[in-house]
Amino acid sequence: MVLNYIQRWFKWVIPTFGFLAIHYIYIISLTIIASILLFTGGTTTKIKYIDALFLASSATTQTGLNSVDLNSLSIWQQFILYGFTAITVPIWMHGSISFIRLYWFRRKFKDVVRQNRTRKFQRKLRKSLMKKSEDDEEQGVRGRKIRVMLPYLHSLRSPTSLKNFSRFDTHDSTNNPYFPDNPPSPKADISKDEYFGKYLPKKSDTLDMDLESHNMTFHDYEPSIENKNYDFGSSHSASMQMYEMDDLHPRLRRQSSFISSVNPLEADDTRETLSEGALVQESLPMAYSYSDTNLVVSRDSFTLTGDDNLFPEGGLRPANTIDGIVRSSLSSSSLSKDTEPSTVDMHIAFTGLNKPTIERERNLKLRKKSRFYKKSLRSRFSRGLHRPIRWTKSFTSNRRNLTLERVLSSAFAKKREPSISSRHTTMSLPYLSYNPTVDRNSAFVALSKEQRDELGGIEYRALKCVCSMVTLYFIIFNIAAFVTFIVFAYTAVGSREVIDSYDLRRGWWALFSSASSFNDLGFSLIPSSFVPMNRNIFLLLISSLFIIAGNTGFPCFFRTFIWTTYKLYPFSFEKKEAMAFLLDHPRRCFTLLFPSGATWVLFFVLLLLNVIDLVLFMVLDTGSKAVASLPKGIRVVNAIFQSVCTRTAGFTSVSISELHPAVLVSYMVMMYISVYPVAINMRNTNVYEERSLGVYRTEDDEGKSFLKDHLTEQLSYDLWYIFLGLFIICICEGGKISNPLDTDFSIFTVLFEVVSAYGTVGLSTGLSSSNCSLSARFTTISKLVIIALELRGRHRGLPRAVDRAILLPSEKNNLKEEEDYQRRHGFSIDNARGSIAVSRD
């Protein structure tokens, strides 16, 4: 009851308020809850509610400004700051969006997901039953030896007969005894000799063939629509032998056993269980390709792949190989354009006899580069050796309604279809069965309903991948940060004295400081932050790494994390398809994951900003009191640490108030633009970028950039808040600012505090009388202004309502993409679909 009420409430709230409003509600609600807990949680000293609200706001927005000394708080109050920070960081928030979208995807396809789980359980059960010894597999199927033979070739012994006998009828039992109209059921009580004697040719009726020196291909045919006959090619051998299973390679015997062991009653599940190593096509017939190591059902039905070591030099090989997946020799061009696909029932091809090709060598090199190729193939064989295949000659009679499960497993199901005006159709893996029309920023347009469903399937799997990867990333980096800090706290020289001097437990200091670094909070239990430890190179550098990985550098680190996992970990092919789609079109699935080019741009921009801060620090602060006592090498490390903290965390390893005024100005500028690199990338890669800006470009504006539009919009939002906040605070703190004896207050220090709050950084010139931020001496109204600036600054750069990565699955999203495409290109989407349909025909 309660769950249904919550679901109805979310269904009403999300479309009504939009993502940004919900984000505000979430942050403000947690701020109020945290402030109440902080206000009531003090045991030794009580703090004012305005200070509790100020600390709670700094924690939930990751600002890091403190109006009271954190070391004076109780452990419970410190833990509240720690916990509420963890559930409001950008990684948590954007990851939660992915989980919510995944939940709605599952609700939309709940029946299909239930079927998917059932089939997955059946596959696991079947796999456990198939764990037999190697000797048992060598015996064939149910103790029988399997013969590989060509049907109805006993009359084609001479070349003359071969020319005269170009076709045979597959439905006439008198002319074609090897394709009976009513084959017996495998479950029928028929003896082996009786079955093979009735339906299979005798050994004397077979055609001998020298496999060492000839090619034989049966695909130059023009089948009759009325009779469904077969046409044999003109270049064939004059002799052929029947091969017993004992004469074949052991792996071929197992594969042949699998092909010959057919259970039509279980065939409905076959299309799902062979999704990793099989290709399924409904509209085209089954086609077989034979090699010395494979018995392959070709592209338009099933394909079973073999280990590379099993292919001898100069022997038979599969015709095509893409990324370790063996394709069949049957191409779409082999079918006549005027022929309906359903009129052909079988095709047998012998390809690659003693014919080394450039493609073969290239494929061999590609397979050797893959460390887990052989292992993955063996696992695929072990999963699929005894899986059933229908006796039926095509799958046209088994057509079912399109379901999500078939969408998820049909990446190779259909032949590639052309696209119109595609800006980008290159795919890391062929996760779609058609060549999509991909417009700006991964906008898929001019697609049919079936193509949209298939795109939704791969997007659903990519979304599952995002959820698992972002969870792993968050957990791994938090654990790694804690381990490094705990090692420092218990092993570093001098660390014990510093931590113990403030009556802190080293384990709790390590946990709090590591989370504060990775979550970019900037709070430190040591009142002077990192100043007492500014000579420890390890702590400063490792903290800088976690600070970058948790905030501004997260898109770069996260894409590298996904790409490395995609390359090294031996996933199933279905999961690799999802990861490939995620890397190709990241902004359809996750707000903080950018395409490769945009990620590199972000990386170099961040590097440039850090280098600028580093150079200014080293040049302008050479003789300042803050760094004069530090050796040159330690000074460089402190410069790196401070340049990183300027735009994110707000930690300090030197006294900020003692730095050169020009350095303080540069820090203020860096705090102001801290969110710009990520925000501009996020909006520039938005699928609905033009819709969010209200500006639509045409084909003539192809080379123009939207950077100017983004900057103009961002500045128009930001500057008003900053100057309005500064104006109100100057009114409230006018007496302190005008007092010449009060050195802590000036127009510049107040502006520095305002920009730090709006940029959610947390740097402050501080107070000479206490270890707090300048805000500690503000009046209540000024503190409320700082809180408002923190909340507004936390939400700048977030995606608007029109962002594909935050929208729930809906047909309206597809209409938005196509409307934008139509406005930009100036033609009807219906005409675009029509051109695609014509090209398919």
Curated annotation (Swiss-Prot):
Name of the gene encoding the protein in the UniProt record: trk1
Swiss-Prot/TrEMBL keywords: Cell membrane, Glycoprotein, Ion transport, Membrane, Potassium, Potassium transport, Transmembrane, Transmembrane helix, Transport
UniProt xrefs under InterPro entries: Cat_transpt, K/Na_transp_Trk1/HKT1, Trk1_fungi, TrkH_K-transport
Gene Ontology molecular function: high-affinity potassium ion transmembrane transporter activity; potassium ion transmembrane transporter activity
Main location: membrane
The keyword ATP-binding is assigned to this record: no
Chain positions covered by the region annotation Disordered: 173-192
Name recorded for this polypeptide: Potassium transport protein 1
Organism name: Schizosaccharomyces pombe (strain 972 / ATCC 24843)
UniProt superkingdom: Eukaryota
Pfam families named in the record: TrkH
BP GO terms, sorted: intracellular potassium ion homeostasis; potassium ion import across plasma membrane; potassium ion transmembrane transport
Role played: Together with TRK2, defines the major, high-affinity potassium influx transport system. Involved in maintenance of the proper sodium/potassium ratio in the cell and in regulating the plasma membrane potential.
Family statement: Belongs to the TrkH potassium transport family.
Transmembrane segments: 24-44, 80-100, 469-489, 507-527, 537-557, 600-620, 662-682, 715-735, 747-767
Keyword presence, Transmembrane: yes
Lineage: Eukaryota, Fungi, Dikarya, Ascomycota, Taphrinomycotina
Single GO cellular component term: Golgi apparatus
Glycosylation-annotated residues: 116, 164, 215, 401, 771
Membrane-topology descriptor: Multi-pass membrane protein
Compartments, record wording: Cell membrane
